[in-house]
C-alpha cells in the first residue's frame, strides 16, 4: 500500500504543478495537493491507487 503524507498541504490554494495521482475513485488528480484535498473531503475514504494518470 502506497500512502501520501497530506500533512504538508493546505486545504486550498494548490499549485498548478502537474504530477498526476490516480485515486481509488478512478479519478486522476493533478498533484498531491489536489489529491489530499479530495482525501480530506472524503473523510479519509479515498486512497491512492497509483502514481500517474488513471
Swiss-Prot record:
- Where found? Secreted
Kindly list the cysteine pairs connected by disulfide bridges: 6-36, 14-33, 22-54
Gene Ontology CC: one annotated term: extracellular region
Q: Which UniProt keywords apply?
A: Disulfide bond, Glycoprotein, Protease inhibitor, Repeat, Secreted, Serine protease inhibitor
Glycosylated residues are 43
In this chain the Kazal-like domain maps to 4-54
Indicate the annotated site residue(s) for Reactive bond 3. Answer: 16-17
Gene3D superfamilies annotated for this entry?
3.30.60.30
Query: Which GO MF terms does the UniProt record name?
Result: serine-type endopeptidase inhibitor activity
Share the domain note from the entry.
Answer: Avian ovomucoid consists of three homologous, tandem Kazal family inhibitory domains.
Secretion signal span: none
Q: Which species does the entry assign this protein to?
A: Aepypodius arfakianus (Wattled brush turkey)
Broad class of where this protein is predominantly found: secreted
Record protein name field:
Ovomucoid
Q: Which InterPro entries match?
A: Bifunctional_prot_inhibitor (IPR051597), Kazal_dom (IPR002350), Kazal_dom_sf (IPR036058)
PROSITE patterns with a match to the protein in the record: KAZAL_1, KAZAL_2
Lineage: superkingdom: Eukaryota
